[in-house]
UniProtKB/Swiss-Prot annotation:
Job description of the protein: Produces ATP from ADP in the presence of a proton gradient across the membrane. The gamma chain is believed to be important in regulating ATPase activity and the flow of protons through the CF(0) complex.
Keywords, alphabetical: ATP synthesis, Cell inner membrane, Cell membrane, CF(1), Hydrogen ion transport, Ion transport, Membrane, Transport
Protein name: ATP synthase gamma chain
GO molecular function: ATP binding; proton-transporting ATP synthase activity, rotational mechanism
Family: Belongs to the ATPase gamma chain family.
Signal peptide feature range: none
One annotated GO biological process: proton motive force-driven plasma membrane ATP synthesis
Origin species: Mannheimia succiniciproducens (strain KCTC 0769BP / MBEL55E)
Compartment(s): Cell inner membrane
Membrane topology, as annotated: Peripheral membrane protein
Subunit structure as annotated in this protein's UniProt entry: F-type ATPases have 2 components, CF(1) - the catalytic core - and CF(0) - the membrane proton channel. CF(1) has five subunits: alpha(3), beta(3), gamma(1), delta(1), epsilon(1). CF(0) has three main subunits: a, b and c.
GO cellular component: plasma membrane; proton-transporting ATP synthase complex
Record CDD domains: F1-ATPase_gamma
Length: 289
């Protein structure tokens, strides 16, 4: 059995770690709430611009933007959004498993795959697999902006426009609630058809004169919309990261508490055994006299 001093040292070490994990839990909670506010603030913009795109595309008879045209898929691009830091449970691993399953399905159909990766964890993972990384970005911090994402987003959009890929998919972690985050995998371009049932009456009752012409407006709106989708996915993934880290750090803090209790019990037993031995020695000495 370890000595009382050794056990005390272990208890102090675990208590120090517990303070760190508790602080990380509190920081993650605060960051998660701020990120949720950014998610809520950006969503109305994205939804409104998507509805305008639907209306303009219907008004632009005879013109189809490349981002709206389906074509035979021989090459696929994927934009994967991961985290820059760890200590967030199985968040990244679950996302990577989903992505690898999709890649496997495409390769079985003879479709080649290229990836663009946001986040250092994803970059390291896909490099280790030897996959071709078309574009990458990391070091975003806790408050990413649309501007810093334009480089990698436009790289992937240009690859689609130039015919280097025939479809682009977006993979990230979707924030459900504090205890639940799930991998999300969706087609980004060609833009999926929008359900406009609830806009039908408005579109029949109203018509618009577009300045400049609908073609120029549609070109601009589609680019802005796709950029906003990438930004929203990054913010969604960031909220998922902070929630997962909060849960992981809470579990670590609780486990540290349990370990401290166990070590304290071992220490008490060791101390009791030491006192018993000393009493036995005193009694034995008295009997010898």
């Amino acid at each position: 059995m370890a000595s009382g001093k050794e056990i005390k040292t272990k208890i102090a070490s675990v208590q120090s770690t517990q303070k760190i994990t508790k602080a990380m839990e509190m920081v993650a909670t605060s960051k998660m709430r701020k990120t949720q506010d950014r998610m809520a603030a950006s969503r109305p913009y994205s939804e409104t611009i998507r509805n305008v795109i639907s209306h303009v595309s219907k008004a632009s008879i005879g013109y189809k933007h490349p981002f709206l045209v389906e074509r035979e898929v021989k090459k696929v691009g994927m934009l994967v959004i991961s985290t820059d830091r760890g200590m967030c449970g199985g968040l990244n691993i679950n996302l990577f498993k989903t992505v690898l399953n999709e890649i496997k399905k495409w390769k079985e159909q003879g479709i080649t795959v290229e990836v663009g990766v946001i986040g250092s964890k994803g970059i390291a993972f896909f490099r280790s697999l030897g996959l071709k990384i078309r574009a990458q970005h990391s070091g975003m911090g806790d408050n990413p902006s649309v501007e810093e994402l334009l480089g990698i987003a436009n790289d992937m959009f240009d690859a689609y426009k130039d015919g280097k890929i025939d479809a682009l998919y977006l993979a990230h972690n979707q924030f459900i609630n504090t205890m639940s985050q799930k991998p999300s995998f969706a087609q980004l371009v060609p833009l999926p058809e929008l359900d406009t049932d609830n806009l039908g009456e408005r579109q029949q009752a109203w018509d618009y004169i577009y300045e400049p012409d609908p073609k120029m407006l549609l070109d601009s709106l589609l680019t802005r919309y796709l950029e906003s989708q990438v930004y929203q996915s990054v913010v969604d993934n960031l909220a998922s990261e902070q929630a997962a880290r909060m849960v992981a750090m809470k579990a670590a803090t609780d486990n540290a508490g349990n370990l401290i209790n166990d070590l304290q019990l071992v220490y008490n037993k060791a101390r009791q055994a030491s006192i018993t031995n000393e009493l036995n020695e005193i009694v034995a000495g008295a009997a010898a006299i």
